[in-house]
Amino acid sequence: ITELVDEAERKVFQIADQGTRGSGPLRISDFLARAVDRIDILFHSDQVITGLSTAYKDLDEMTSGLQPADLVIVAGRPSMGKTTFAMNIAEHAAIQGDKPVLIFSMEMPGQALAMRMMSSLGRIDQHKIRTGKLADEDWPRVTSAVSMLSEAKMFIDDTPALSPGEVRARARRVTKEQGALGLIVIDY
């Protein structure tokens, strides 16, 4: 029955998309007026970060923040901190930016991500969190991190091996419930 519901939802979204798929290639002149309008808005703004702040000052200065509809790919060798980097940005977007954030974690269970975020926000060594060997002074920081995360509009889907269509359908469901998402992270 789940497959049937997913297929029906996919078909409904497919029908809805047919009216919004655009008109195909257009001349650049068709985009110039909107581009100039955007530049004018930015010119009159006192904001240095025009997108979503990443919490990484140098990165924000180079990119002006993550811009709507940007696709950002973080690449690196195994165990080089890609997940930690992405989760730090997600934490910042959800907590400091007060934006809904959706995380698809196809390799790591949601509980493990939550523990990493508690470690990060509480500034507690991950080894202590993983082993449960916390000192008395760590517990208030754990409580503070849990409080911040529980207030955040952060959603984790740790279903392994989702297809692009499934990711899209699930993102649309969360968008329908929460409004526009500030960030979608796919950790694969």
Q: In which residue ranges do the predicted regions lie?
A:
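Cytosolic-facing regulatory segments adjacent to core modules
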Residues: 61, 84, 92-180
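Short, small/acidic-rich helices and loops at N termini and domain boundaries
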Residues: 1-45, 49, 69, 75, ...
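Helical hairpin unit composed of two closely spaced alpha helices linked by a short loop
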Residues: 181-188
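Ser/Thr-centric signal marking residues that sit
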Residues: 54, 78, 83-84
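N-terminal cationic and glycine-rich segments that engage phosphates or anionic surfaces
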Residues: 89
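Pre-Walker A adenine-sensing motif
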Residues: 56-65
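Catalytic-site beta-strand/loop segments enriched in glycine and acidic/polar residues
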Residues: 65-73, 186
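Short gly/ser/thr-rich secondary-structure transition/capping motifs
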Residues: 53-57, 167-168
